[in-house]
Amino acid sequence: MIIGVGIDVVSIDRFQAKKSDEFIKKLLTEHEQNKYKTVIGESNQNIFLAIRWSLKEAIFKALKTWDEFTQLEIRKIHGAYECSLNEKIKLHLSISHEGQRLVAMAVAERI
């Protein structure tokens, strides 16, 4: 049963100014921070941050709740983004971007 749908749209270039250590620690889990450190190129770093921000916002909207961003870990597995909460809720995630706009969608399903 679907329990919620969340959508978020961001401008990728806005993350150019948001690369402080404080912002990174508030947005990313430790594992995500380690992945971020391996991303080469400013544009790719902006996209990495925009994807995580937008997916986490969409997830919170789908769940109709708000928590710390670091409570959610986004992983890219076989080309698809995933986030596990618990065995009772499955999250279906999707992103798309064109130019400087990125849209993320999350569907929360009770299983």
Swiss-Prot record:
Keyword Lipid biosynthesis: yes
Cofactor(s), names only, from the UniProt record: Mg(2+)
A GO cellular component annotation in the UniProt record: cytoplasm
This enzyme's EC code(s): 2.7.8.7
Locations listed in the record: Cytoplasm
Coiled coil: none
GO biological process, one term: fatty acid biosynthetic process
UniProt binding sites for Mg(2+): D8, E57
GO molecular function, one term: magnesium ion binding
Keywords: Cytoplasm, Fatty acid biosynthesis, Fatty acid metabolism, Lipid biosynthesis, Lipid metabolism, Magnesium, Metal-binding, Transferase
Gene3D superfamilies: 4'-phosphopantetheinyl transferase domain (3.90.470.20)
Stored Pfam families: ACPS
The reaction(s) this protein catalyses: apo-[ACP] + CoA = holo-[ACP] + adenosine 3',5'-bisphosphate + H(+)
Alphabetical list of HAMAP family matching this protein: AcpS (MF_00101)
Biological role stated in the UniProt entry: Transfers the 4'-phosphopantetheine moiety from coenzyme A to a Ser of acyl-carrier-protein.
Family to which the UniProt record says this protein belongs: Belongs to the P-Pant transferase superfamily. AcpS family.
Protein name: Holo-[acyl-carrier-protein] synthase
Originating species: Mycoplasmoides gallisepticum (strain R(low / passage 15 / clone 2))
Upper classification of the organism: Bacteria, Bacillati, Mycoplasmatota, Mycoplasmoidales, Mycoplasmoidaceae
